Amino acid sequence: MYQNFGQFIDGKWTPSSDGGVYEVVNPSNEEILGNASKATNRDVEQALHSAKKGLEIWKKTPAWERSAKIRKIADLIRDKKDIVANWIALEVGKPFAQGQGEAIASADIFEWNAEETKRIYGQIVESRFADTRIQIKYEPVGVVAALTPWNFPTILAARKISTALAAGCSVICKPDMVTPGSVMQLVDIVREAGIPAGVVNLLSGDPASISSQLLSSDIVKKISITGSTRVGKIILKQAAEKVQRVTMELS
């Protein structure tokens, strides 16, 4: 099932640099779904440099153009909702109808952020000096590392990716090892929508090693994580070393 995917780096699906894979199991019947690609340190480095390059392109893309591409992602998710739902059903063990609901909700999030892209307003502030005004302009924070859980793999990846895209940021998404295909399918839709190479990247594999390498890099400027409180504490402590911005949703 995973042969068409792998690591998504610089706009392309590629196997891991050493060809490593791991088994993904269907929780409803404990059958092996297939072998998903397992990222190496080299893959992580390539993804980091890809995201850095993608940021330079995306942050200069006009808001209305970004909005149109994000809206196209929403439309494609709706067109492919049954494919997305099938991945969710197989990997998470949810009923197919719930998978469809998650797919539709994911599309709604992309549509919402497509419009929010146009509403990133600055401010004009009065100055203490005559004939002078202060302009406040918001700029993309930079490369975002998005760490997603297994229980709602598509909708939470959609929330993180679409928000980063709306703000003009590039993103490296790390799905849970249990549900890589659900997020891979979403990222492939992003590719199909014409998002420039390097703007969205995906790393599949061991969460601890990948997350640690991402956070230790000077390229990553923000981390978004949905996960356990235990993992959140680890992430927050590591991010503090570089004063990286962190957004957490913890259980």
Where are these regions (language model features)?
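An amphipathic alpha-helix/helix-turn recognition signal
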Residues: 25, 42, 46, 61, ...
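Hydrophobic residues in alpha-helical segments
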Residues: 8, 55-59, 77, 165, ...
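Histidine- and aromatic-rich ligand-binding microenvironments
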Residues: 7-9, 23-26, 35-46, 194-199, ...
